Amino acid sequence: MRIVVKVGTSTLAYPTGRLNIRHAEELVKVLSDLKNEGHEVILVSSGAIGMGVGKLSLPARPKDTTTKQACAAVGQCELMYTYDRLFSAYDHTVAQILLTGVDVEHTERRVNIQNTLTRLLELGALPIINENDSVATDEITSIGDNDTLAAIVACCCKADLLVLLSDIDGLYTAHRPRRLCQAVRLGQEGDRRKRSSRQVRRERHHGRRYLVRYDQLR
């Protein structure tokens, strides 16, 4: 089975931007186990800007574009270093792919992305994809968020399953206005699977506002 997994900044890092080592190790352990079972895994990972904030010891997440780009450049190195180190412990090789809106909109580039992903999976590597926040700054070059990027990647590589991981406490059964929505707490595993197609809109401390489909890796 070919699986695309997306993980966000709020899952990987603390509000300070520092890496949540326990969460990162648990994620890598689960994904490595999936690969050991014979599944093809692609990881779409946020976290570059947040980790850049921590690495540069900034007091807060910057608001200006240039500093955000600088944080993304620094944080992406830290992010990939962490993934490479953790996956190496399970004898898995990772590969970095950074994309922009231009890459996914342009037909020839999209085909190149598909070919690269296919070959990496054939070689047994685990592709790790992120939006190239160091250069993607406007409506033309920016994809918007990594939930959208994960969906694009899943379609591009003809994935069998798309999993969007989140640390939210519950799900809404409908869109806004919220007074018309029923708040559903996450229950037992069976309930989670049954509700996997429902969507939630929630804003986290480092993430953008996004739509999430909850599912499980097991």
What is the predicted role of each segment?
Residues M1-L217:
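Nucleotide/pyrophosphate-binding catalytic subdomain
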